[in-house]
């Protein structure tokens, strides 16, 4: 994974955490997106949780890459969930009606529970 991402596996769920507070640079977004798509396309991972805790801003390019990733995960019969969104970013998801597309959970624990993982 890129220096900007941290991944870990919890009982079959791949959790991706972001190191950057502001995800705005088009080149970085493209690189992160490609690496996350690789999790789906080459490693055949079907349960991916994106944890945005600590992320303060997402650009429109980041939203586009998330839509692309969500489609790829669904195409292989998987489920992508999102957690840890700041109120401002959650509001942007709602304004763009992306909350209708993505399964957004408040906490990582809530998301893992939705995958059937219990602590």
Feature roles, as predicted:
Residues 12, 87, 109:
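Residues that form or immediately flank small-molecule/cofactor binding pockets and catalytic motifs
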């Amino acid at each position: 994974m890129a220096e900007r991402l941290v991944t870990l596996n919890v009982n079959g769920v791949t959790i991706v955490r972001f190191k950057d507070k502001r995800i705005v640079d088009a080149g970085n977004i493209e690189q992160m997106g490609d690496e996350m798509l690789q999790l789906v396309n080459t490693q055949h991972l079907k349960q991916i949780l994106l944890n945005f805790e600590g992320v303060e801003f997402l650009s429109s390019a980041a939203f586009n890459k998330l839509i692309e990733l969500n489609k790829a995960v669904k195409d292989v019969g998987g489920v992508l969930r999102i957690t840890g969104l700041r109120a401002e970013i959650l509001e942007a998801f709602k304004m763009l009606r992306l909350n209708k597309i993505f399964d957004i959970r408040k906490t990582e624990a809530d998301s893992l529970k939705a995958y059937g993982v219990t602590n």
